[in-house]
Structure formats: C-alpha cells, structure tokens
Amino acid sequence: MLMPFEIMETIKMIQEENLDIRTITMGISLRDCASSNSKETRDKIYNKITRLAANLVKVGEDIEKEFGIPIVNKRISVTPISLVAESSDEENYIKFAETLDKAADAVGVNFIGGFSALVQKGYTIGDRRLIASIPEALSSTKKVCSSVNVASTKAGINMDAVREMGHVIKKAAELSADSGGLACAKLVVFANVPEDNPFMAGAFHGVGEPECVINVGVSGPGVVKSALEKVRGADFETVSETIKKTAFKITRMGQLVAREASRRLGVAFGIVDLSLAPTPTIGDSVAHILEEMGLEKCGTHGTTAALALLNDAVKKGGTMASSSVGGLSGAFIPVSEDAGMIDAVKAGALSIEKLEAMTCVCSVGLDMIVVPGDTSEETISAIIADEAAIGVINNKTTAVRIIPAPGKKVGDIVEFGGLLGSGPVMKVSNFSSRDFINRGGRIPAPLNSLRN
C-alpha cells in the first residue's frame, strides 16, 4: 500500500529535484537487412526502423502524461552498421548514416546510435570503411551517433585503431568547426563496450540482443544530493545507506516506465541503466553530490574516494530494485554536461589527469572533455590509450568522448547547447606521445583475462 508521504516524496523528486527518465531507447536488429546491393540494404534499414519505432515517441509522451514522469529523450539504437553494410557494394558508408538520420527524423526520435564498429582485436573490411566514414557522416547528419570499441579485457588494446581514432576525431572536429567541433560530441571510443547501453552517443544494438528491445536510462543526481543534505555530517555508512535507498526509488521508477513502454509497444523489455546522468541545469550535478559529501570543490583530494562510494551505493540500491540492470550503470562525469564539473574546471580544481583517476571507479570515462584545437592526433590517441588501459586491466567499461575545439585555447568556453551544455577548454600535456602511438600493433590482453 502506498503511503501519502511516499507519494509526496515522489512528486517533490520530480518537481523540485530534477528526477526524470533520461531516455527510452528502442534497440533494433538490422542483421536481416544486409544484402550485396547497398540501395536495397538502405531501403530495408529505413523501412524496418520506421515500422518498429513508428509509435515510440507517442508511447513515451503518453506514459509521461499518464504517470507524470518526465521522459527527456526517445532514442533508437541499431546493429553496428559496419556489420550490416559490410556485404554491400559501397566503398564508404556515409549514405548509410544519412539513411539512419532520415529514419530518425521520420519517427521523431532525438538520436539514433549504431554507426559503430567493434575492432578490439582487428579490422574487417566493413570496419575500415565505417571508421573512415565517421568524420563526414557525423558532420553531415544531425541525429546519428557513432562508437568504436578499440579494446577489451579478452583481446587487449588495438593500438592501430587507437591511433586511427585520433585522426578521425581531429577530422570530425575540423569538418564541424562552425559548431565548435560538435561532431565529436556524437562519437565515443570504448573499451569493453556494453551491447545494451541506452545512453548516447555510445548506444548500439548488440549481436546477442533480441530482434527489438526497450532499454531505459534513469537520472536523478539532484535527488541524491537532496537526500544527502538531510544527513549532513553523518558518517560514511549513513551516506552509503542514504544513496542506496534513493537509488532504489529512482530505479523502481525506471523499471515501471520500461515495462510499460515495452508492453504498449509489444516488444521485449531489456534493461534499466542505473547511471546518474547529470545535465547543465543547476541542481542536477554529480559534482555537487561529491561536494555535498564534504569536498570544497570536485577534483580536490578525496574526490576519487567520494565517487567510488557514490558509484557503489547506486549499484547496490539499484540492483535491489530491478533484476534487469545493465548498460553502463554507475555515475557519469561528463564535464560540459555537469554544472558542478564546469565550475570545478574553471576554478582550477579539476584536471584531465584527475578525471582519469576518477574513471577508475565510476561508470564510463573521460566524457565531453574539450581540449585546445591544436591538440595533436597522437595526444588524443594517447588519452584514448590510457583510458582503454584502465578498462582492460580492471575489466570495466571505459570510454573517451573528446572535442578538440577548432581555434580554441585553454580557458575558452565552447557552447554546445541543450543537454550537451558548454565546455571549458582543458589543458593537455605539452609533451609528445608520438613515438609511443606510432608503434602500432596490439597491447596484449592482461593475465586476468584468463578466467576459465
């Protein structure tokens, strides 16, 4: 039986503490669309997406109205296009990206993910074609998102792919220079990528997934901060317990929406992603949660420990609320999308090096990092390599979403707008990693990959 105080608590979470469902993401398998004729393949892709996702936006809006729960985004993820397009006669896959963009427009979703390649152990022909197409594909489309998995604990790190992604990111930034390198905000480089992630820009529909599935990503940093304000000065066991209870409530709401959406759309329910996803809105910041624990500024000594506590407690609370937890599930630390992170960078408290340490204990990695436009390809590749190493050795997902903003220098601010926010340009090392990156080859899998 629902108690009146629980109802009022939920209303307060939504109205005052920015609780929302960040995304309902429909995953669609395109494996049956592959053919040797590229136009036929693209027609099949468009028809299948528009058929299965025809009611996705309407159902999301109906649930939002009926339940009173804000649903910020409706999105689609598809089978990695490098797999679907590989048997076609196309030399580059830009037209496939345009087809995805057209389909996303037709059904009214915010983003579509899956312009992706999995190259942790090496390239196929389709992988090479897709990766070469990324800069132009992302700069010429509005809703298409791309991801490349360059490493895994089982395979090690494909350093040839790491090197190439440095070039791809620089090229994407140049082609979208008029928007501050916005194309790079739609590109993520992963290690140990999950196949059921509902969040962009890294979402794609894995080959082990069903024909069609609904995955939901929750949010709620403001709710967690508000809960911690009530136990200010208490010990860490109390802090952890408070976060766990709050994460339970947030996840329950996500599970409710996910099951209802899958029922109404007539497709399978997949997972709830527990990730605390911040926005540039004041009161919706992961950094402010860490500061509520007692840090003067996010990035000071103790930040990594505070984030580890937060991430662990969120998972413990969330897994008690749902038996279908997946995706990334933790705490996101995207600099440009988090008001507290932005302030910390401006104050000089938060550096790329500290963010890298934080990624050892949180959900993803170096996310929405803006660096000077003259940052070299090799430096970007080296940043990716460092992050991939953390993921591979620790058997966790890590990622890099980095924007070398054309014409910008350290201290400048780049405005992206919307959920992407604004990013202060951060300093990178002045010393070169060129000779290291140009070695190429593959960093072998670690000993802890042998688990049988």
Curated annotation (Swiss-Prot):
NCBIfam families: PRK05313.1. Pfam families: DUF711. It comes from the Bacteria. Homodimer. InterPro entries: UPF0210 (IPR007841). Belongs to the UPF0210 family. This is UPF0210 protein Cthe_0410.
